[in-house]
Amino acid sequence: MSLIVFTGGARSGKSAAAQELAAARSRDGARVVVAVFGQPIDQEMQDRIERHRTDRPDHFETIEATEASSWVAAVPDGALLVVDCLGTLLGLLMDEEQEPDRVRPRFDELVGWIIRRPGDTIVVTNEVGEGVVPAYESGRVFRDILGRANRILANEADCAYLVVCGRLVDLTSMPRHAAWPSD
C-alpha cells in the first residue's frame, strides 16, 4: 500500500501528474478508480468536468461523486484510487454542512479513511494559504481545514510532490523540522 500526494496551485499539472503515475501502474495490471467531485453548477464548471473526463484514459473507472461521503462505499478494495481533488471534496462537504464545526470532523474522517484504506492511493490537492487571508469566514475555514489535511497527508505519504508549472518538486526528502545552522 502506497500513499502519494500531489499538491500545487490551480492549473499547475497536479491531475496530469497523478494520471500519468496511475497509467503507469495500470500498465502493470493495476485496476484504477478515479474519484472526482464537484457539481456542474455553471457552464465553466461543466466544461472543466468534461475536459477532465476526456483527459482520463478510457480504462480508468470513474466515480463522479455528488455527495461528500457517498463515493467511499463504491471504491473497490485493492484498486488504485486516485482522489481528484481533495479541495473539491472539501467544497462539496462545506455545501452539505453549513456549520464549520461539523465540517472538520467529517473531513478528518474522510482523510483518515484515505490514509488507512487497503490499496494504493494517489491524492490530488490544492496548496492553500500562500495568498491573502480570505475575506469571508467560509474561505478561512476552507483554507484552514484543507491546509491541515494537506500537512497530515504529506506526513503520512510515501511520496509527496509540489507541482509548479508542470514540474514536480519532491517534498518527501525535505526536512519536517527546522534546525539551527551549524557553527
Sequence positions of predicted segments:
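Short, flexible active-site-adjacent loop segments at beta-strand->alpha-helix junctions, enriched
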Residues: G38, T66, L86-G87, E127-V128, ...
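Residue-level signal for inorganic ion chemistry
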Residues: A18, H52, V82, N126, ...
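Helix-adjacent hinge/juxtasegments
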Residues: T54, D58-P105
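A structural micro-motif
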Residues: A30, D58-F60, A79, G119, ...
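Charged, low-complexity C-terminal accessory regions
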Residues: M1-A10, A24, G29-A35, C159-D183
